[in-house]
Protein backbone atom coordinates (compact mmCIF):
# COMPACT_ATOMS: atom_id res chain seq x y z
CA UNK A 1 0.00 0.00 0.00
CA UNK A 2 1.16 3.54 -0.78
CA UNK A 3 -0.02 6.96 0.39
CA UNK A 4 0.85 10.10 -1.59
CA UNK A 5 0.09 13.68 -0.63
CA UNK A 6 -0.49 15.42 -3.96
CA UNK A 7 -1.61 18.82 -2.69
CA UNK A 8 -2.46 20.68 0.49
CA UNK A 9 -5.94 19.14 0.49
CA UNK A 10 -5.58 15.94 -1.55
CA UNK A 11 -4.09 12.60 -0.57
CA UNK A 12 -4.02 9.41 -2.63
CA UNK A 13 -4.10 5.89 -1.22
CA UNK A 14 -3.04 3.11 -3.57
CA UNK A 15 -4.32 -0.07 -1.97
CA UNK A 16 -3.40 -3.58 -2.98
CA UNK A 17 -6.54 -5.70 -2.97
CA UNK A 18 -7.04 -9.41 -3.05
CA UNK A 19 -8.76 -10.94 -6.11
CA UNK A 20 -11.84 -11.82 -4.04
CA UNK A 21 -12.31 -8.21 -2.85
CA UNK A 22 -14.87 -6.09 -4.66
CA UNK A 23 -15.87 -2.44 -4.83
CA UNK A 24 -18.14 -2.81 -1.78
CA UNK A 25 -15.15 -3.95 0.29
CA UNK A 26 -13.21 -0.89 -0.88
CA UNK A 27 -16.15 1.36 -0.01
CA UNK A 28 -16.26 -0.10 3.52
CA UNK A 29 -12.54 0.55 3.96
CA UNK A 30 -12.92 4.10 2.62
CA UNK A 31 -15.86 4.74 4.96
CA UNK A 32 -13.78 3.63 7.95
CA UNK A 33 -10.97 5.99 6.87
CA UNK A 34 -13.46 8.86 6.56
CA UNK A 35 -14.93 8.03 9.99
CA UNK A 36 -11.45 8.00 11.55
CA UNK A 37 -10.44 11.29 9.95
CA UNK A 38 -13.65 12.99 11.02
CA UNK A 39 -13.98 11.40 14.44
CA UNK A 40 -10.39 11.49 15.64
CA UNK A 41 -8.94 14.42 13.70
CA UNK A 42 -11.99 16.57 12.82
CA UNK A 43 -11.01 16.52 9.16
CA UNK A 44 -13.82 16.58 6.58
CA UNK A 45 -13.03 13.99 3.94
CA UNK A 46 -14.50 12.74 0.68
CA UNK A 47 -13.14 9.61 -0.97
CA UNK A 48 -13.30 8.77 -4.66
CA UNK A 49 -12.64 5.18 -5.70
CA UNK A 50 -11.38 4.28 -9.17
CA UNK A 51 -11.78 0.86 -10.75
CA UNK A 52 -9.38 -1.85 -9.57
CA UNK A 53 -6.42 -2.40 -11.88
CA UNK A 54 -4.26 -5.39 -12.62
CA UNK A 55 -1.25 -3.53 -13.97
CA UNK A 56 0.68 -0.56 -12.58
CA UNK A 57 0.51 1.19 -15.98
CA UNK A 58 -3.26 1.58 -15.46
CA UNK A 59 -2.78 3.43 -12.16
CA UNK A 60 -3.15 6.89 -13.73
CA UNK A 61 -6.44 5.86 -15.32
CA UNK A 62 -7.85 4.58 -12.01
CA UNK A 63 -6.68 7.77 -10.27
CA UNK A 64 -8.48 9.88 -12.89
CA UNK A 65 -11.64 7.80 -12.34
CA UNK A 66 -11.43 8.47 -8.59
CA UNK A 67 -11.17 12.20 -9.30
CA UNK A 68 -14.17 12.03 -11.65
CA UNK A 69 -16.12 10.12 -9.00
CA UNK A 70 -15.54 12.94 -6.50
CA UNK A 71 -16.44 15.64 -9.05
CA UNK A 72 -19.64 13.87 -10.08
CA UNK A 73 -20.46 13.21 -6.42
CA UNK A 74 -20.21 16.95 -5.66
CA UNK A 75 -22.98 17.54 -8.19
CA UNK A 76 -25.33 14.58 -7.87
CA UNK A 77 -24.76 13.06 -4.43
CA UNK A 78 -23.54 15.76 -2.06
CA UNK A 79 -24.37 13.76 1.07
CA UNK A 80 -22.11 10.79 0.27
CA UNK A 81 -18.54 10.81 1.47
CA UNK A 82 -17.44 7.71 -0.42
CA UNK A 83 -18.12 7.68 -4.14
CA UNK A 84 -17.11 4.82 -6.40
CA UNK A 85 -16.59 5.32 -10.12
CA UNK A 86 -18.28 1.97 -10.73
CA UNK A 87 -21.52 3.22 -9.15
CA UNK A 88 -21.89 6.62 -10.83
CA UNK A 89 -24.36 5.30 -13.39
CA UNK A 90 -26.12 7.83 -15.57
CA UNK A 91 -24.72 10.72 -13.54
CA UNK A 92 -21.33 10.04 -15.15
CA UNK A 93 -22.84 10.34 -18.63
CA UNK A 94 -24.68 13.55 -17.83
CA UNK A 95 -21.55 15.05 -16.29
CA UNK A 96 -19.70 14.59 -19.58
CA UNK A 97 -22.34 16.34 -21.70
CA UNK A 98 -21.90 19.91 -22.95
CA UNK A 99 -24.26 22.37 -21.24
CA UNK A 100 -25.72 23.43 -24.58
CA UNK A 101 -26.93 19.87 -25.17
CA UNK A 102 -28.34 19.70 -21.64
CA UNK A 103 -30.19 22.98 -22.05
CA UNK A 104 -31.65 21.78 -25.37
CA UNK A 105 -32.80 18.56 -23.68
CA UNK A 106 -34.60 20.50 -20.92
CA UNK A 107 -36.30 22.73 -23.52
CA UNK A 108 -37.49 19.63 -25.41
CA UNK A 109 -38.80 17.89 -22.31
CA UNK A 110 -40.55 20.84 -20.72
CA UNK A 111 -41.50 22.73 -23.89
CA UNK A 112 -43.20 25.97 -22.81
CA UNK A 113 -43.08 25.25 -19.07
CA UNK A 114 -39.84 25.34 -17.16
CA UNK A 115 -38.72 22.76 -14.66
CA UNK A 116 -38.32 25.75 -12.35
CA UNK A 117 -42.10 26.20 -12.35
CA UNK A 118 -42.44 23.08 -10.18
CA UNK A 119 -42.75 23.99 -6.50
CA UNK A 120 -40.77 22.32 -3.71
CA UNK A 121 -43.71 20.16 -2.58
CA UNK A 122 -44.19 18.82 -6.10
CA UNK A 123 -40.49 18.03 -6.49
CA UNK A 124 -40.49 16.33 -3.07
CA UNK A 125 -43.51 14.25 -4.13
CA UNK A 126 -41.77 13.24 -7.36
CA UNK A 127 -38.59 12.30 -5.51
CA UNK A 128 -40.51 10.08 -3.08
CA UNK A 129 -42.47 8.53 -5.98
CA UNK A 130 -39.18 7.60 -7.67
CA UNK A 131 -37.71 6.28 -4.41
CA UNK A 132 -40.76 4.01 -4.07
CA UNK A 133 -40.29 2.62 -7.60
CA UNK A 134 -43.34 4.42 -9.05
CA UNK A 135 -45.61 2.72 -6.52
CA UNK A 136 -48.57 5.00 -5.78
CA UNK A 137 -49.72 3.16 -2.63
CA UNK A 138 -46.26 3.05 -1.01
CA UNK A 139 -45.57 6.67 -1.87
CA UNK A 140 -48.88 7.93 -0.50
CA UNK A 141 -48.24 5.98 2.72
CA UNK A 142 -44.75 7.45 2.99
CA UNK A 143 -46.01 10.97 2.37
CA UNK A 144 -48.94 10.48 4.77
CA UNK A 145 -51.43 11.55 2.10
CA UNK A 146 -54.47 9.81 0.68
CA UNK A 147 -53.79 7.77 -2.44
CA UNK A 148 -56.15 10.00 -4.45
CA UNK A 149 -54.20 13.08 -3.34
CA UNK A 150 -51.05 11.58 -4.81
CA UNK A 151 -52.87 10.61 -8.01
CA UNK A 152 -54.13 14.21 -8.23
CA UNK A 153 -50.56 15.54 -7.83
CA UNK A 154 -49.26 13.17 -10.49
CA UNK A 155 -52.04 14.26 -12.83
CA UNK A 156 -51.15 17.89 -12.18
CA UNK A 157 -47.55 17.10 -13.15
CA UNK A 158 -48.76 15.34 -16.31
CA UNK A 159 -50.80 18.40 -17.32
CA UNK A 160 -47.89 20.72 -16.62
CA UNK A 161 -45.14 18.68 -18.31
CA UNK A 162 -46.92 16.24 -20.59
CA UNK A 163 -45.16 13.38 -18.78
CA UNK A 164 -47.12 10.69 -16.93
CA UNK A 165 -44.75 9.64 -14.18
CA UNK A 166 -46.66 6.39 -13.68
CA UNK A 167 -45.37 5.40 -17.13
CA UNK A 168 -41.83 4.02 -16.84
CA UNK A 169 -40.49 5.73 -20.00
CA UNK A 170 -41.89 9.11 -18.96
CA UNK A 171 -40.51 8.63 -15.46
CA UNK A 172 -37.03 7.96 -16.87
CA UNK A 173 -37.18 11.09 -19.02
CA UNK A 174 -38.27 13.16 -16.02
CA UNK A 175 -35.60 11.64 -13.72
CA UNK A 176 -32.88 12.38 -16.28
CA UNK A 177 -34.26 15.92 -16.69
CA UNK A 178 -34.02 16.47 -12.92
CA UNK A 179 -30.43 15.24 -12.97
CA UNK A 180 -29.60 17.46 -15.95
CA UNK A 181 -31.08 20.45 -14.12
CA UNK A 182 -28.98 19.65 -11.05
CA UNK A 183 -25.90 19.37 -13.25
CA UNK A 184 -26.58 22.72 -14.95
CA UNK A 185 -27.11 24.39 -11.60
CA UNK A 186 -23.72 23.15 -10.42
CA UNK A 187 -21.81 23.75 -13.70
CA UNK A 188 -23.38 26.73 -15.47
CA UNK A 189 -20.72 27.29 -18.14
CA UNK A 190 -19.14 24.08 -19.39
CA UNK A 191 -18.42 24.06 -23.17
At which residue positions do the language-model features occur?
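Cytosolic nucleotide-utilizing catalytic cores of signal-transduction proteins
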Residues: 1-191
Amino acid sequence: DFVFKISETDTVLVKEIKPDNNTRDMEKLAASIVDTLQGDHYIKAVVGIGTPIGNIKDLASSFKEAQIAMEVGKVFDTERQVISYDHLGIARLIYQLPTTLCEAFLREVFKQESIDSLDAETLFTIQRFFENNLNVSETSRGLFVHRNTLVYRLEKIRKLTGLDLRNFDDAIVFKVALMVKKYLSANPAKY
